[in-house]
Amino acid sequence: MHELAIATALAESLIKYSREHNAVISCAHVRCGILSGIDPEALQFAWEPAAANFPGSGLENCRLQINRALLQHRCSSCNKVFEFDSWQIECPECKTETLRRESGNEFVLESIEVENV
């Protein structure tokens, strides 16, 4: 389960930010693409033990909010950007099959919520 390693790396990054800014992080918002190879349920399950590995870090009560990113493509002909949750091989606008993937394989820390200290 590589989600535990990902959750641990995320916790380490949040701790670094927390220490640099003297902040307590209450929630981390991440975007996880459907082609990222990360199972959102497994990542959510791994978050609590990963955060607990750093006692006194302030992450003990930090929530993890996972937003799922669909596949997003741009048509090379008409430049339309569209999302879908299945394999699609043509533009819904002009029916061209020359598509460029814009997103869907990312894992990004989008934002954090910080408590007043």
Located regions from the model:
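Cys/His-enriched microdomains
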Residues: 73, 89, 107
